[in-house]
Amino acid sequence: MTRIAFLRHGPTDWNAQGRIQGHTDIGLSQAGIARMAALRLPPLCDGARVFVSPLARARHTARLLGLEDGNTDARLMEQNWGAWEGLTRDEILAQ
């Protein structure tokens, strides 16, 4: 049986600030690095093929979890939010 698991990248400073990231290549925050480094995946993930977004936050998360990030796929990137990237919801509504 084929199993598919999805894991979101670790936290970034923009996540903490409520900012839209989209395609902007924001790295993990220090708290995000610590959080991902402390996680352990279940044994059923051993030897799994891993596919990640080409964005640094996704690739770094994979490496911190002991996963190879060699299979990058742009289709896994977050939506491109254009001019809204980097803004908070309140900033967008104020425009």
Q: What label would you give each PLM region?
A:
Residues 65-95:
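Phosphate-handling substructures
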Residues 2, 7-68:
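Active-site-proximal alpha-helix that buttresses catalytic centers in soluble enzyme cores
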